[in-house]
Amino acid sequence: MKIAVLMDAPLRATLLSEKTMARLAEWGEVAVNETDKAEKETVKQIIAGADIAITSWGVPQLDKEILDCAPNLRFVAHAAGSVKGIVSDELYARGIRVVSSARILSYGVSETALGLTICACKNVFAFNEEIRNGGWVEDYSVITELFDITVGVVGCGFAGSHYIELLQAFGVNVLAYDPLLDEAAIAAMGAKKADLDTLLAESDVVSLHAPAPVSYTHLRAHETVLDLV
């Protein structure tokens, strides 16, 4: 069995430890990209004859031209979030299974979002700048506790739903907007479903976890969102 690791060498060194590479070698022949970029011609050479491909950021779309180099390819493991950049109609037509790290990566994203929420409520960034410049702020009215307030969550995918889960440790009311989920699904996460206008009007904090399909493009021009920036 041949395993083709397609991401560029610097990224591979970041994502795949020596231990991981050794484990892959136990499964079969491992071909890696030794260059600084995942150019299409390089990818075609590495994937030739492969049964499994490991991709990540920067790898080109696995189109017919690339897939023709690997007629036995059956599995693609994407060491990143969204697979939109690598999948093609040809990939699906051949019945090649694709998995990604989206769920695992979402934990770090949601934890960071919670950390930034706390920092924003405590006005940490402004206080830090004030202290760095030799000042000191005594006005505690600019601090908001993450308690007895309403937090709005826009988008309840992997990151948004885990962010809601983390908020359960705090005494906050959570409103959630996601046009793809019904009231019961959002309630099971620990939030109350709301339309976007209601969420923006009633929330003290808004955390955006919306992806970028057409159904969300109106967010960019929403006047209330712009007012929050």
Segments (PLM) and residue ranges:
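Phosphate-binding beta-alpha-beta segment of Rossmann-like dinucleotide-binding domains, i.e.
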Residues: 94-96, 101-150, 165, 169
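Short acidic-hydrophobic, aromatic-tinged amphipathic segments that line or gate anion-handling sites
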Residues: 192-195
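Glycine-rich Rossmann-fold phosphate-binding loop(s) that bind the pyrophosphate
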Residues: 156-157
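N-terminal Rossmann-fold NAD(P) dinucleotide-binding loop
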Residues: 160-161
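Short loop/helix-cap segments at secondary-structure boundaries that form the rim of catalytic
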Residues: 86-90, 181-189
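NAD(P)-binding Rossmann-fold cofactor-contacting core
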Residues: 170-186
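Conserved small/polar residues in nucleotide/adenosyl-binding loops
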Residues: 217-224
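An N-terminal-biased, well-structured beta-alpha scaffold segment characteristic
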Residues: 1-99, 201, 209
